C-alpha cells in the first residue's frame, strides 16, 4: 500500500506536496507553522487539509503496523499463502483487514473447533460438496466415543460450516455493504416509558434508511436507547415476512457455497448462519458505524461553531463591568481595566433595585466603565433591564451594554487556573471577571476553558470524547495562531496554544517576563529556559512584540524572512518604519524581484500583505443584538413576532438562535433563505446577529420554530421550504406512512429539536 499515493488522491494534491507535508510533520513542525510559513514546500496546503492529512496518515500507518502483526501471526501458523498475503497487503481499511484475519485469529475454543477435534471436518466437507439428501445416513460413518449419534455428528458439522460461512471475508464484505445500503433503522418506545421519554416522541415509531440517517437523529435515538426510552433494531425485510421465507441475504450465502434449493439441512444451516451469527455481528457493526459517522459530523459541527466563537470580534480595550446574574445569590459584579486587570468587585441583588442602581452607577463613574457585559444565564433579562436603565441614565458616559454567553464561566471559576490567577477572590466572583474579559477579547478568555464547556456543540456529551477533545484542541490551536498573541501581555493558557509551545514553556515565558520585564525583541525569547532554536522557529512568527527594537517583531513576518524585508528596504531606500503600514510604498514593490530558492512567491506575497497591514486581526467588526423589551420567557413569545437574536449554534439541519428567553429557537435549514441552502454555514455562523420571525411556540416541550424569511406566514402558503430542500428532506428519512407528510418548518423544529442533558 502506497500511503503517499492514497493521501494524494484523497486530498487532491500531488505526491510532492504530500511527501513534503509528511516530512515536515515527522520533523516536529506544527500544522499552523506549515500552513503559514512552508507554503512553497506543501504547495499551499491549508490548515484544514493538513489536519486531514495528519489524521489519515496516522490511520494508514496504524493499518500498516496491524498488517505486519497479522501477516506474522498467520505465517507462524503455517497458513500464509501468496494469495492471502496479497489480499492482506491490498486491504485499504481496518475492517477489510480484520475480515481477512478472522479465520486465523486466535480465539477461545468454539463449537466448530471442538467438532473439528472430534473428527467431523470430513463430514462437513462431504455434506457441503456432495449435498446428500439423507444426512443422517451420511453421519453414521463419523460416530466415535465423543460423537454418540447422528444428531451430535450433524450438530458438529453444522457448527463447522456456520463458522466457515461466517468467516468468508469476501462474503462478509458483500453482506455488510448490502445491509448498510438497504437496511432501515427502526426505533420504538420502550413500553411504559412514553411519559418519561416524551422528549424522544419523534422516535417512538420511526423507520428510515440507516445509511441516510442524519447525525443529529442518529445521536438522538442512540441517546434515547442509552436512557432506556427507545429500542433500536435494524430491519432488512418487512415485519410481516414469514419466518420461514428465505431472505436475500440467505440466498447470497447459499449461492456463495452452491447450496441447492432442495437441500433442507444445508438451507437451515445457511438460515442459522445469517440470523444467529452474521446478522447479529453486522447489525452491531452497522450501529457502531452509524455512531462513528454521526460522531464525525457532530464533531465537525462543534469544531466549526467553536472556531466561529473563538474568532468572534473583540469589543476592544475598554474598561468593562462584568455582571454574572443570579436571584438568591445576587448579581456578581467585576470591573476590569482595558488590559483585563481586575479593579473592583461587588455583589448586588435584583430585589434591591435602587441599591443595585446606585452601586453600579458608582462603579461605572469611579472606574470609567465603557462596556457592561451581562451573562445570559438565570436572571439575565432582569439584570439586562437594570443595565438598560443605567445606560439611559448616563448618556454622557458613552456606555454600552451587551449580553454575552456565560457558558463555561462557572467551570473556569472553580478551576485551578482561576485559583492561581485570583487566589484571594471568591469563586462566585471569578465568573464575573471571565464574563467581562470574554467581551473584551473572546479568544484570550475562552482558551482558559475546556472547549466542551463552551456549549456550541451538537450532542457534545454523546460523541467520542477523545476524538472530540483532539478536534477541539486543533481548532483552538489554529485560531490562536491565526490571530497571534502579544508576548508581553498574553496569559500562560493563551501562550500554551502557540505553535511549538506547551504549558511548561508558556509558564516559563510568563515567569521570565515577570522577572526581567517586557521582551523588547523576539530574539529575547531565546533566553527563556527550555525555549531552543527549534521551538523558536515554530513559535516566533505567531508571537508579537509591540513597541520593541525591531518593527517587524510586531508583525506576522517570520524572523527567518527579515533578510528579505531588508532587501526590499534597500531597493526602496527607506527604513522599516517608513515602509510598514505604508500601502502606497508596499504596492511599489514587485514580489517576483525577491523570490529565491528558499522563499517563493507565496511567502513573498504574504510578507507584502503583512507589511501593508502589520499584525492584522482576521476577526471581524464587533456587533451586538438588541433583545426585545418585555420578552423574558418562552411564554412571552407570540407567533408572528419579529425579533433580533444571536446565532448560538449551527447544525447540519439549521441554526439555533438565542432570542433572550433562555431557550434557543430553531431556524430550520429550509427557513434560512428564499434560495436553496446546501450548508447552513453558507448563510450564518455562531455569533451572527440575525432577525427572525416566530413561527411556532411549544412551551410545554420548550421548542421554538423561527424563520429568517420574514415574509413567511405561520402555516401559510409562503411557509414552505425551497423545492430542493423538500426533495432532500424526503430522501433523508422515512417515517411509517401514517406520519409521512410534507414537512413544514414547525414540523422540522419538532423533528430536529435540540436535546440537552
Swiss-Prot record:
Keywords: RNA-binding. Gene3D superfamilies: Nucleic acid-binding proteins, RuvA domain 2-like, Tex N-terminal region-like, Tex RuvX-like domain-like, YqgF/RNase H-like domain. It comes from the Bacteria. It holds the Pfam family Tex_central_region. One of its GO terms (molecular function) is structural constituent of ribosome. Residues 710-757 are annotated as: Disordered. One of its GO terms (cellular component) is cytosol. The keyword RNA-binding applies. InterPro entries: HHH_9 (IPR041692), NA-bd_OB-fold (IPR012340), Ribos_protein_bS1-like (IPR050437), RNaseH-like_sf (IPR012337), RuvA_2-like (IPR010994), S1_domain (IPR003029), S1_Tex (IPR044146), Tex-like_central_region (IPR055179). GO terms for biological process: nucleobase-containing compound metabolic process; translation. This is Transcriptional accessory protein Tex. The lineage of its organism: Bacteria, Pseudomonadati, Pseudomonadota, Betaproteobacteria, Neisseriales.
